[in-house]
């Protein structure tokens, strides 16, 4: 049985999808993947372990079943070895990165193959106008209302962009964006927003073309203390 109301957001070097778990059915997953399951609503049972909203589970090379009444987001990559793990993280225990515009929760820590983050931006704030040289990412807006800012003329170099070169689109709950390397983008929060992002693991690959706090490119060590 597959997840009900399944939505697929990405099928590239990683897979990213969501769906509902129904009390009347059991969903069984094969064991040939490295997966992260993030419960965002309700609660469910995974092999006798209860996941409540905000809890996550990392599973590798393990066949498992889920049942309950919940909505989950799942990120996965094919497994390339025979190692096993089954790692539970309770809500409130995920690695947190404080940002000037809000914060990030690293749902699967610093996994070497893919990243899964919850990103919160508070009303009236915005992330950097940025691009990535290698990182590919898929951003789902779970809660709130935002504006998606992007460069609509590819003939202009990212580092030479001015405000007149940028376009703006509504970005609302339930929308998602797939961002490939070199694509200039920014999210501006019209309300408090919560996004769920899955990406390739180049977490320090951030080129900030404009930043309200004038932060440099790459990882900001002070945000990780």
Sequence positions of predicted segments:
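Cytosolic regulatory regions built on CNB/CRP/Popeye-like sensor folds
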Residues: 1-2, 33-35, 47, 53-58, ...
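A short glycine-rich, His/Asp/Glu-containing loop-to-beta-strand
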Residues: 1-28, 92-136, 167
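Tight coil/turn sites that cap or link beta-strands
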Residues: 22-25, 54-56, 60-62, 69, ...
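Glycine- and acidic-residue-biased ligand/ion/polar-headgroup-sensing regions
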Residues: 25, 31-47, 133-158
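Short hydrophobic/aromatic-rich beta-strand segments that constitute the beta-sheet cores
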Residues: 46, 74, 128-129, 148-150, ...
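Short acidic-glycine-tyrosine-enriched beta hairpin
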Residues: 47-62, 152-184
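Double-stranded beta-helix
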Residues: 67-99, 154-164, 184-186, 190-225
């Amino acid at each position: 049985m597959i997840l009900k109301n399944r939505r697929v957001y990405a099928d590239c070097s990683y897979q990213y999808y969501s769906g509902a778990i129904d009390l009347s059915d059991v969903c069984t997953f094969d064991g040939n993947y490295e997966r992260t399951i993030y419960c965002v609503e309700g609660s469910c049972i995974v092999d006798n372990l209860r996941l409540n909203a905000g809890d996550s589970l990392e599973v590798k090379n393990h066949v498992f079943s889920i049942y309950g009444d919940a909505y989950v987001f799942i990120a996965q990559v094919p497994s390339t070895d025979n190692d096993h793990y089954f790692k539970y993280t309770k809500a409130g225990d995920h690695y947190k990165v404080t940002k000037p515009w809000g914060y990030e929760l690293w749902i699967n820590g610093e996994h070497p193959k893919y990243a899964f983050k919850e990103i919160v931006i508070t009303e009236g704030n915005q992330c950097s106008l940025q691009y990535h040289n290698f990182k590919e990412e898929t951003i789902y807006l779970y809660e709130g209302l935002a504006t998606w800012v992007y460069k609509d003329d590819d003939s202009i170099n990212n580092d030479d962009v001015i405000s007149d070169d940028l376009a703006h689109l509504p970005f609302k709950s339930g929308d998602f964006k797939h961002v490939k390397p070199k694509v200039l983008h920014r999210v501006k929060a019209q309300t408090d927003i919560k996004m769920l992002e899955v990406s390739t693991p180049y977490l320090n690959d951030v080129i900030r073309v404009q930043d309200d706090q004038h932060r440099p490119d790459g990882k900001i060590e002070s945000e990780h203390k």
